[in-house]
């Protein structure tokens, strides 16, 4: 009986390891949960706890980008916008506004009450060059343990390319 229980547990563990999984909705400290990807008056953050693996395609991840509004119209100051984004790590494509909308909240980091949605057409982008979007996408893929464009160290390579570009400009 003990042997049967142990074999059953091992089998369930092995089956569980082979299934594509969602990343756990981790309770991260605020400073660990959000990665600032764009500085400025209205900084944009990657919500690392929102990264999910598509159950139909393990190379496809979804995540939220959050913009904290600290400038512009007084009515919007102190609010935030949340945008669902998807990335296919294998073929380096991203879909911005995957759910065709921005969600606007009363507080920073998509906290507080949801005020309204702003419709926005989803846009598919194929990333061939090093750009801010490709850096964000590679970061998401790396965080989820996926290769970006089938390259193990894609993020490091892109950072080196950016360093070379900035050296040639000076």
Give, region by region, the residue ranges found by the protein language model.
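Generic signature of intrinsically disordered, low-complexity, basic-rich segments
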Residues: 1, 14-16, 150
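N-terminal secretory-pathway/extracellular module detecting exported/lumenal segments
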Residues: 18-83, 88-170
């Amino acid at each position: 009986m003990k042997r049967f229980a142990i074999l059953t547990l091992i089998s369930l563990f092995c089956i569980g390891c082979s299934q594509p999984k969602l990343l756990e909705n981790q309770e991260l400290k605020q400073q660990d949960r959000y990665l600032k990807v764009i500085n400025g008056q209205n900084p944009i953050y990657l919500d690392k706890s929102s990264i999910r693996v598509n159950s139909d395609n393990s190379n496809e991840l979804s995540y939220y980008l959050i913009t904290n509004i600290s400038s512009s119209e007084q009515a919007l100051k102190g609010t935030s916008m949340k945008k669902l984004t998807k990335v296919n790590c294998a073929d380096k494509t991203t879909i911005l506004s995957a759910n065709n909308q921005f969600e606007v909240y009363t507080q920073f980091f998509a906290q507080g009450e949801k005020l309204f949605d702003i419709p926005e057409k989803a846009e598919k982008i194929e990333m061939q060059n090093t750009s801010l979007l490709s850096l964000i996408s590679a970061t998401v893929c790396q965080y989820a343990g996926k290769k970006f464009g089938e390259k193990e160290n894609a993020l490091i390579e892109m950072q080196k390319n950016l360093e070379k570009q900035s050296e040639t400009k000076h």
